[in-house]
């Protein structure tokens, strides 16, 4: 469905009340008759899980595909484990040494399971017609780190800079084409997950992440296609570089103070965050409600803040805790 996303964003910022967009695809899968593994191998089943999440939480401002971030690495040849009701995980890196980068082939943007996620967007837009639909994919440095293995990639940015740039370049080339594929089939935007960049220093993040993210944003973002950049690391000192990518939405994890982040991020973009998935898993509804109320109070003066989780929520999280989060939001909105 074609939506002017600049208007969508502006309406959220100008609204009196606060909105919410938690990343909770996986806990909503049990609302269908399918397992997690079934939904990430079948676009129609994934779309039904997306619709189930909207039916369960009807005020969410958008719908998202499953945050299966193994998809991109799998396209490059990684071995992926698929538990029946857990998030897929990369078991083995594709390359182990920097000198292997030159021979690494960039896969077609429709290889692996990519088209399942494209099918999910197409099918979801038949079921969800009143709000945007977002696809999900990794960011360039995070994909590069998955391909090489994180600890080796973190060393390579120091000891093998040329090869690491070549690897991030190949990741970016693939991710641009994948983002274009989402845009071509009618998605309203992407959730670009770049968590591994949060481990880098601000200088290294600018060199190995921000400039490549900007290329993805420049290739696809316009008034009808919206990029939300996610980094759940300790990125308080990286906000200028993140904003410089040109993305129009920024999603933060619980490693940062959202009051500080909202102050640093200009109010012409949306800022999402940041209840910890671990807390949503381990704590009860009363605690979650209190934590949400505290977060909302901390961000009260920032109209560009959107309540969310700090990252994707594991399948085991009880939906009663999401209910508690929304209950706190509804009570807060009565005071604004």
Where on the chain are the PLM-derived regions?
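Surface-exposed strand-loop-strand hairpins of Gram-negative outer-membrane beta-barrel proteins
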Residues: 34-45
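A contiguous, low-structure linker/loop signature
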Residues: 70-107, 130
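Catalytic domains of carbohydrate-active enzymes, especially glycoside hydrolases
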Residues: 46-66, 181-188, 244-247
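Short active-site-adjacent helix-start/loop capping segments
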Residues: 29-31, 62-64, 71-83, 143-144
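Acidic/polar N-terminal loop/beta-strand segments that form early-domain functional surfaces
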Residues: 23-26, 49, 65-70
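Active-site loop segments of alpha/beta catalytic cores
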Residues: 1-29, 36-37, 106-336
